[in-house]
C-alpha cells in the first residue's frame, strides 16, 4: 500500500512537467523493452525534453504509480497532466498520428 505522500509526489511530478514518462531505467539506459519503446516513440515525435521517473529507483513510486492511474504496467506516459497510456497505447497512438497531435499541444515540441 502506498502512502498519500507517495501519491502527492507522483501528482507533483505529473503536474510539474508537460510530458512525463514513468519508466524502468533511464532514457539512455532503459531497463525493459517497453520503456525503451516509449522513449523511442517520444524521440520519433520530436519531443525535445520530457521528464522521466525511474521507478526502479523507488519502490513506493513503482507501486504508487500503478494506483495513481489505476494502470497495472510500466511505462506510463502523462501529457499535460493526463494519463495517456502504456507502451502499447503510446505505440498505437503514434502509428495513428494521435500522439503527435497531443504532443503538439505542449511547449516541448519544436
Located regions from the model:
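Non-catalytic, surface beta->alpha helical segment in thiol-disulfide oxidoreductase systems
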Residues: 79-109
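Thiol-based oxidoreductase modules, predominantly thioredoxin-like and allied folds used
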Residues: 47-62
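Structural motif corresponding to alpha-helix initiation and N-cap regions
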Residues: 3-7, 58-62, 96
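Acidic beta-strand-to-loop metal/phosphate-binding motif
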Residues: 22, 76-80
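Local sequence-structure signature of Cys/Sec-based thiol-disulfide redox active-site neighborhoods
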Residues: 11-49
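Thiol/disulfide oxidoreductase modules built on the thioredoxin-like
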Residues: 67-73
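N-terminal leader/targeting and pre-domain segments
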Residues: 1-20, 110
